[in-house]
Amino acid sequence: MTGLERQLTEMLESAVVASGYELVGLEFIRAGEHSTLRIYIDHENGITVEDCAEVSHQVSAVLDVEDPISVAYSLEVSSPGLDRPLFKPAHYEQFIGQEVNVVLKMAVANRRKWKGEIHSVDGEAITLTVDGQQEEFALSNISKANLIPKF
């Protein structure tokens, strides 16, 4: 998580929670002149398009007042989806036993991309079962992690 993403999470979480939703996480993606702030929300009853519109309205109001982003960007609010991104230690704990794709900031054993089943979480690191072997990764070294949907 970048410094800006951390700042945005702290700034927006209370608005999302006050609307009755969980802020799963967010990503600020810079792609040349077209940046995107993508916010993932969830609710025990699932997420509808109307839910996304409501949260978008609330979040936009906060962003308009605080103005933390200095470049033009698009705001997207969505459910985490089947390939749910994992941002917090609690997310990894919630999905112990599920298969994930993990991209690391710094390579471990000459690899940045890993695929395995979440075996355990200790707060600072996760352990994946990869090809029958246990591999431990510091949460601070994880750039991106997504569930692999089962069909």
From Swiss-Prot:
InterPro entries: Ribosome_maturation_RimP, RimP_C, RimP_C_sf, RimP_N, RimP_N_sf. GO terms for cellular component: cytosol. It is found in: Cytoplasm. It comes from the Bacteria. Keywords: Cytoplasm, Ribosome biogenesis. GO terms for biological process: ribosomal small subunit assembly; translation. The keyword Cytoplasm applies. Belongs to the RimP family. Required for maturation of 30S ribosomal subunits. NCBIfam families: PRK00092.1-1. This is Ribosome maturation factor RimP. It comes from Vibrio vulnificus (strain YJ016). The gene is rimP.
